[in-house]
Amino acid sequence: MKYRYIVAAVVVAVPLGLAATVFGPVGPDCPDVAGLRDYRPPEASRVFALDGSLIPDLSPQRRVVVEYDEIPAVLRDGLVAVEDRRFWDHGGVDLRGVLRAVWRNATSLSFREGFSTIPMQLARNVFPDQLPRTKSLSRKICEIRLAPKLEDEFAKEDILELYLNQVYLGSGLYGVEAAAEGYFGKSVSE
């Protein structure tokens, strides 16, 4: 049984090592994170009636951008606990998470376990044209390359703010403010 784990680990580690060696210096063309300095997630127009009530939104995508300080700490902490426990400690890519995912996938002979950090997910979400949702090695390599660049360019709080305003939360709702309004009829700060 132990032999199976060793073989599985080698079968996964060798191709990953080769891919890093081959694609690391050259690799796919990845977007430039410097352009995100002025980035604002797209928001749907909001139309109000004469009495001040919001007219129902007909847009397929709803988003309301909020500042980091408007998002309750319990929500920020909860997201980090679920999505990326070591967010405050790593430099964009969580090597322990990568090793954990490789080990679990190798020992189960499946690809169920992921290792995307919040910066990696943010890269995928803000560059949908360059990093399509379909799983591919080139997309993952770009995410791995972009995450440390995001960490160099932005403070952790800025990354979390961008992520929480960008993330899709179901029912056409993007970002935590739109989700709070859509699901609970309240602002995220409430």
Model feature map: region roles:
Residues 1-47, 86, 106:
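N-terminal type II signal-anchor transmembrane helix
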Residues 42-44, 48-190:
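Peptidoglycan glycan-strand catalytic modules in the bacterial/periplasmic cell-wall system
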